Structure formats: C-alpha cells, structure tokens
Amino acid sequence: MHRLLAWDAACLPPPPAAFRPMEVANFYYEPDCLAYGAKAARAAPRAPAAEPAIGEHERAIDFSPYLEPLAPAAADFAAPAPAHHDFLSDLFADDYGAKPSKKPSDYGYVSLGRAGAKAAPPACFPPPPPAALKAEPGFEPADCKRADDAPAMAAGFPFALRAYLGYQATPSGSSGSLSTSSSSSPPGTPSPADAKAAPAACFAGPPAAPAKAKAKKAVDKLSDEYKMRRERNNIAVRKSRDKAKMRNLETQHKVLELTAENERLQKKVEQLSRELSTLRNLFKQLPEPLLASAGHC
C-alpha cells in the first residue's frame, strides 16, 4: 500500500471533478518516485507581486490542463504509460485478490497514471484529463437482482456504489410510486433460513384417509334368526307408534275437558258479577238511618 503524505502540486496535480471532494483533506497517495528514494521536484515559482500573496506551506496550482480544449487531452490519453500503475487498481488487487467478485463492476474509475504520460515528468504522475463518468444503472425490482447480488453482498464490497430508491406502495390497488425523500432505507434481504424453508403450509397434501370402519357381519336374510329379529323390531315399532297415538288422544281429551271447565267458570263469574251489581243497587236505594241502625246491630 502507498503511504499518505501532504499534497504537493509539483508531483501530483489537483484531481479532476470526480475526485474534488478529496481536496478538503489535502492528502493524496504518495507517487511511485518517492518509493524508490528519489526526491520530488520543487514547487513552481511563486506568483508575481501583483497577485495575492500565499503562505509558506501553500503551493501554486496550474489549471492549464483543464482550460485547454479536449482534443489534445484525448490524444495524450490514447498513449498509456506502462511505467506507472493505477493506485486504485493496485488497491483493489491487494484487497480483493482472494475474493473475486462474481459480477463485474458497472462503474468506470479514472486512472491517474495513464492519462497525459508524455507531458509529465518521468518521476511524477501526469495531470489526467477530465474523464466522463458512467451513469448509474436504473432502478430494478429487488426480487430480480436479489439472487445475483447475494454472493457479492455477502463477500462485502465497500467501494461499490448502489443507488437504492425508496419504493412506496399504496394499499388502494393503484400503482406504486418511487420516493427518495419519504423512505431512505434499502429493501430488505431475505435470510438464508427463510429462503431454504419449504413452504409446507402453502402446498399441504390431501388429508389422511380415516381408518376403515369395522366390516359388518354378513347376515343371511333367508335365515330364521333374521326373520325373528325383523318380527321383534316390527312389533316394537308398532308398540311405540300405538303409545304415541294414545298420548295424543289423551292430550286432546284433556284439552277438551279443560276448555269445558274454563267455559263453566267464565259463566259463573258472569253470574256473580251480575248479582254483585244488583246488591249494590239495592244498598244505594235504602235510606241512611236504616243503614246506620243496621250497622249497630
């Protein structure tokens, strides 16, 4: 692995737009020239007095490779420099040499040692031209890529950039909508135990057949025993039917008797009510002194 040291503009020019976030830390990888004991070239001369002064620890930055047209840069980029190695390629070869990824990466990385080899000093990395970055792959359902990405995700690839979009489904039956602000968590990955489990509940076999009932004893319908049994059964059935008829007749007779008794009692109540009303009328017609004397007796 290469060592890290302070940034030097003479040996390692500023990175292109794809690597600009690294400018905040002001640290870059050491070039190959320092690994062999050679000293890096001194910084470029300071700016004229008319420009703003810079500190002792700062270096002037040459933006001429970025301001020139892209045609010379493309011509320089066509001739690779075999003397320098891409530090990203070495990094990936050291870290993942024993664990090759089954699926090739979909992203293109910028090489710092191949571009502009003719114009750079022999002991330093040349300034690379701005390279076009490959667009991110489109969104695909998680179920389609889950089987292909499972081995790569298990091996662990920290530098792989995966763009997950939150998928929000509506329960009303309408089509789902993609939302990046509402949901930020990636879709879940099924566990190996769930994937290997057999769906026994979904594909249940037919129920077990019940045990066969005990076979009935074969009876000869022409035998005397069978005839006697049938006669006994018929007699018992006739007796039960006769008893049911007798109970019905007794119930009907009792209902008739109770109905007649109810009518007789109703007539008696009416007669007593008439006698009571007659007596009340008689008592109302008697004089009060007679009633008072009758009360003392």
Curated annotation (Swiss-Prot):
There is a cross-link at residue 134 (Glycyl lysine isopeptide (Lys-Gly) (interchain with G-Cter in SUMO)). It comes from the Eukaryota. InterPro entries: bZIP (IPR004827), bZIP_sf (IPR046347), C/EBP (IPR031106), C/EBP_chordates (IPR016468). Phosphorylated at Thr-189 by MAPK and CDK2, serves to prime phosphorylation at Thr-180 and Ser-185 by GSK3B and acquire DNA-binding as well as transactivation activities, required to induce adipogenesis. MAPK and CDK2 act sequentially to maintain Thr-189 in the primed phosphorylated state during mitotical cloning expansion and thereby progression of terminal differentiation. Phosphorylation at Ser-105 enhances transactivation activity. Phosphorylation at Ser-277 in response to calcium increases transactivation activity. Phosphorylated at Thr-189 by RPS6KA1. Methylated. Methylation at Arg-3 by CARM1 and at Lys-39 by EHMT2 inhibit transactivation activity. Methylation is probably inhibited by phosphorylation at Thr-189. Residues 22-105 are annotated as: Required for MYC transcriptional repression. Residues 172-201 are annotated as: Disordered. Pfam families: bZIP_2 (PF07716). Disulfide bonds: none annotated. Keywords: Acetylation, Activator, Cytoplasm, Differentiation, DNA-binding, Glycoprotein, Isopeptide bond, Methylation, Nucleus, Phosphoprotein, Transcription, Transcription regulation, Ubl conjugation. The modification N6-acetyllysine is found at residues 39, 99, 102-103. One of its GO terms (cellular component) is condensed chromosome, centromeric region. Residues 227-247 are annotated as: Basic motif. Residues 1-22 are annotated as: Required for Lys-134 sumoylation. Liver and lung. The modification Phosphoserine is found at residues 105, 185, 240, 277. Glycans are attached at residues 181-182. It is found in: Nucleus; Cytoplasm. The keyword Transcription applies. There is a cross-link at residues 103, 134, 145, 212, 214, 284 (Glycyl lysine isopeptide (Lys-Gly) (interchain with G-Cter in SUMO2)). The modification N6-methylated lysine is found at residue 39. GO terms for biological process: brown fat cell differentiation; cellular response to amino acid stimulus; cellular response to interleukin-1; cellular response to lipopolysaccharide; defense response to bacterium; embryonic placenta development; fat cell differentiation; granuloma formation. Residues 223-286 form the bZIP domain. Binds DNA as a homodimer and as a heterodimer. Interacts with MYB; within the complex, MYB and CEBPB bind to different promoter regions. Interacts with ATF4. Binds DNA as a heterodimer with ATF4. Can form stable heterodimers with CEBPA, CEBPD, CEBPE and CEBPG. Interacts with SIX1. Isoform 2 and isoform 3 also form heterodimers. Interacts with TRIM28 and PTGES2. Interacts with PRDM16. Interacts with CCDC85B. Forms a complex with THOC5. Interacts with ZNF638; this interaction increases transcriptional activation. Important transcription factor regulating the expression of genes involved in immune and inflammatory responses. Also plays a significant role in adipogenesis, as well as in the gluconeogenic pathway, liver regeneration, and hematopoiesis. The consensus recognition site is 5'-T[TG]NNGNAA[TG]-3'. Its functional capacity is governed by protein interactions and post-translational protein modifications. During early embryogenesis, plays essential and redundant roles with CEBPA. Belongs to the bZIP family. C/EBP subfamily. This is CCAAT/enhancer-binding protein beta. It comes from Rattus norvegicus. The gene is Cebpb.
